[in-house]
């Protein structure tokens, strides 16, 4: 009813709804941080392309699994130019998957794979999401696999370690639990995200990381406004 009440909107509905809302927000001149896998706006992973994204009025935060795994895949791609295939497998607690996530599983896979292609340059990719009903609830974690011939593992390890430090700047619970290893012709690594436990359960790190990514982008928008 009052579009002047804000300058920026966080949309955490569903992919199909955001496709409708995006046109309305654009007409109203409002920036949108899209937390659904709609593939409408520019894809953003703050540790990779934050500065590039603030020039766009509609920015997509990909998915929780994308925010977790793509930084590691990107770091590997920065150290290795001959990656043939990348696969990411994300596992989250069933209790942390709300109706929006469950309604958008196909969109989740498609958007995560699109983000993976865009950020790494590797066109042959696959994303898998597992909802684990175990009790007690598991922490959010992602495994990253990259098919590479004769990699420079020292360079890969250094690149990934640097990325983990960048991630911790805005996601304190981000942790490398299996550092990059090379076996059977592929690089494998695993990370997990433990939430802060302030508003959401600690096991819901998948929700914390996409929230933290969105807040980081919003803060960058605000800095840009203040500087100009």
Model features per residue range: what roles?
Residues 33-38, 179-186:
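An acidic intrinsically disordered interaction segment
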Residues 211-227:
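Internal hydrophobic alpha-helix adjacent to the cofactor/substrate pocket in enzyme cavities
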Residues 1-83, 87-89:
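N-terminal Rossmann-like NAD(P) cofactor-binding subdomain of oxidoreductases
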Residues 44-52, 203-207, 211-213:
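Solvent-exposed, flexible loop/coil residues
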Residues 67-184, 197, 201-204, 211-212, ...:
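Active-site-lining helix/loop region of Rossmann-like oxidoreductase modules
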Residues 184-194:
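Short, low-order "capping/linker" segments at domain edges
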């Amino acid at each position: 009813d009052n579009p002047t009440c804000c300058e920026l909107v966080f949309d955490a509905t569903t992919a199909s709804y955001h496709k409708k809302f995006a046109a309305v927000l654009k007409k109203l001149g409002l920036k949108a941080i899209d937390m659904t896998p709609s593939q409408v706006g520019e894809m953003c992973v703050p540790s990779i392309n934050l500065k590039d994204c603030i020039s766009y009025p509609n920015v997509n935060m990909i998915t929780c699994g994308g925010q977790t795994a793509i930084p590691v895949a990107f770091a590997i791609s920065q150290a290795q130019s001959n990656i043939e295939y990348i696969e990411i497998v994300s596992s989250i607690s069933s209790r942390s998957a709300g109706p929006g996530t469950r309604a958008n599983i196909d969109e989740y896979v498609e958007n995560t794979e699109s983000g993976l292609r865009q950020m790494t340059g590797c066109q042959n990719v696959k994303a898998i999401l597992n909802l684990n009903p175990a009790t007690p609830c598991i922490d959010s974690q992602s495994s990253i696999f990259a098919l590479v011939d004769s990699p420079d593992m020292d360079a890969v390890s250094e690149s990934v370690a640097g990325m983990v430090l960048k991630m911790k700047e805005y996601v304190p619970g981000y942790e490398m639990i299996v550092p990059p290893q090379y076996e059977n012709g592929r690089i494998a690594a695993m990370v997990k995200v433990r939430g802060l436990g302030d508003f959401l359960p600690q096991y819901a790190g998948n929700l914390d990381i996409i929230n933290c990514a969105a807040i980081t982008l919003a803060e960058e928008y605000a800095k840009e406004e203040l500087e100009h």
